[in-house]
Amino acid sequence: MKANHIRILLLVTIAIMFISLMGKWEQTFPADNTKQQTSATQNNSHYDNADSSTNTDVTITDAKSSLAKETNFSKYDNAKSITINTVVFKDVKVSLLDGAIISASLKDYSISLDDKTPMSLLTDKSGSEYIAKSTIVVNKQPISVNFEDQGIKIENSKQILTLTGSADGLQITRTYTFDDTKYNISVSQNIKNTTSAPVNVIVDDSFARDFDPAGDSFSLLNAHSYTFTGVAYSTAKDSFRKESFKDISKTNGQPTVINSDGQGWVAFLQHYFVSAWIPQSTNAKIYYKNLNGDVFEAGAFTGATIAPNQSENISSILYTGPIIKANLVDLAPNLEKTLDYGMLSFFSEIIFWVMNHIHSLVGNWGLAIILVTCLIKLIFYPLSAKSYRSMAKMRMLQPRIKRLQETYKDDRQALGKKMMELYKEEKVNPLSGCLPMLIQIPIFISLYWVLLESVELRQAPFIFWIHDLSMKDPYFVLPVLMGLSMFLQQKLSPAPADPMQAKVMMFLPVIFTFLFASFPSGLVLYWLTNNLISISQQWIITRHYQATHKK
């Protein structure tokens, strides 16, 4: 295959393959969960397996009925609630009905650039409810507990809310511990059996969310549509799995149950943010399902048999906040994997680590992107220089190549042979010009995911009109400049001998400009910076080579 064919193929690969393949990989080809998952048909109910001493069967209909009651959002409308504020949380509302957390806003993350109101990650807003709850289940039936507020105690930098309640012969004391500067909430409950018989109890820590999966559709020209919205979980056997809400909605309401085989966690995952329940027991079960069409539920339940006049302590950690690796890595094994940079995550993590350190020095993510690009070009300069020297040599050989094409225009086989002899004689590799593009492909894809998934770059400004590097350029200035830089770079490269190839190459800057118009402006900034540095390097090397090799 000719060098220009390969160059065109590489350019198209960068522009199209990574968009259509990388952007949709996890959604189009989800991991096979069948080995570790058990459907509701096999287990009758996700409550059946919570405790090995419980053998009574529960029908699927009974399970659906109990779950539907748990996600009756309107029951919290008239219930009293306690409001807590911390350094990172605004208006965390804990309902006295069942102790559900029905609202939590994040002070450091506004809704948008225009609306500086703290975004509500958990919310009781009608039509978009998203709550975290801890339900007590007795003999496979969820019970409703009307808690009483025992006040908030402050210890060091922590606020401890205590609720007490009783139902079905159980006395329940639940505490919520808020660390002022952290997004994790410790939820601990002491359950005492005041009856004369043993009681099988389940604590079901779960999320319920009203979400329309039809609105979560993929668009080639919307980079943010490539992000994931759905359930994520981790067990001893499966370190990290995801299931989109769209796929869960196709399960006809049947819950999927996973045996954690040790400590695991379950989460609702969305762009930039995650809410996760982390049970502290080793016998928890994890489940997720679709309820009532657009309502989704996922949770982890822990079972215990409590003897008469005895009590059991069951604890969990609730995290609801931004996906920041430093916040997650110590909370639970593999929770940091919710920061998913895709198939090239190894390179993405290195790029982000370098960018983050540069940002700590310069204070601007746009400058950090430019400096990272300069650093990458410096690291790969020896390879690039070799490639540009080869391209300069190819450029000087163009007159001889044209003469060969005229001489052997009717004999393509002879032309190919003579061309190879010429390349061998002059010690030039016609494919070496493709090397810079080959190097860029993994870096481009890795940086793409860093810009798309790192919450640190959400609403991060650069200069002038670029107010958010994670969003497209509102005036398309950077994409146009990037297209012009590609056009200029082509002028420095050897012209394709084939007229058709030449026309295709001429149109590529236009195609790239159109595609990049919808990409995050930070990514376009990287590509523009990379092109400008490449142009400078190629121009200097080409002039030097021509000056020292004139015949």
Curated annotation (Swiss-Prot):
UniProt entry keywords in alphabetical sequence: Cell inner membrane, Cell membrane, Chaperone, Membrane, Protein transport, Transmembrane, Transmembrane helix, Transport
Protein location: Cell inner membrane
One cellular component (GO) term of this entry: plasma membrane
Membrane topology listed for this record: Multi-pass membrane protein
Pfam families for the chain: 60KD_IMP (PF02096), YidC_periplas (PF14849)
InterPro entries reported in the protein's UniProt record: Membr_insert_YidC, Membr_insert_YidC_N, YidC/ALB3/OXA1/COX18, YidC/Oxa/ALB_C, YidC_ALB_C, YidC_periplasmic_sf
Gene Ontology BP, a term: protein insertion into membrane
Superkingdom as given in the UniProt entry: Bacteria
Transmembrane portions of the chain: 3-23, 361-381, 431-451, 504-524
Region (Disordered): 33-55
Gene Ontology MF terms: membrane insertase activity
CDD domains in the cross-refs: 5TM_YidC_Alb3, EcYidC-like_peri
Disulfide bridges in this chain: none
Quaternary assembly: Interacts with the Sec translocase complex via SecD. Specifically interacts with transmembrane segments of nascent integral membrane proteins during membrane integration.
Job description of the protein: Required for the insertion and/or proper folding and/or complex formation of integral membrane proteins into the membrane. Involved in integration of membrane proteins that insert both dependently and independently of the Sec translocase complex, as well as at least some lipoproteins. Aids folding of multispanning membrane proteins.
Family indicated by similarity: Belongs to the OXA1/ALB3/YidC family. Type 1 subfamily.
Protein name as it appears in the record: Membrane protein insertase YidC
Organism: Francisella tularensis subsp. holarctica (strain LVS)
Higher taxonomy: Bacteria, Pseudomonadati, Pseudomonadota, Gammaproteobacteria, Thiotrichales
